[in-house]
Amino acid sequence: MGEKRQKSGYIYVISNSNFPSYYKIGVTEDIKSRLRTYQTSSPLRNYKIEYYIHHPDCYSAEKDIHEQMKHFATNIKNEWFEIGSLQMVIDRVDESLQPKEKILLDLYKK
């Protein structure tokens, strides 16, 4: 009781060209729908999904990633992180996944 059920979905990284070096790391069950949600909140439509990976327990994985990256957080509530480059973000997301999961998930990479 009280345990959150596992849910598969996508861990994604979103950028906004107005804020270089800032990236949002979140989860969704539908990548295209998630991007549309962001675009409606921006008159310039300048959000871009930079990276995503499927995960069998995306909410737990996201929580672990956020915990490991908390020193880069700009505001934990909205999941934005200030980090040097997109590749650094992707590397940290990949590193935070357990090795056995990463082997299986490499098949789902963009």
How does the language model describe each region?
Residues 1-110:
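Non-catalytic accessory segments flanking enzymatic or RNA/DNA-binding domains
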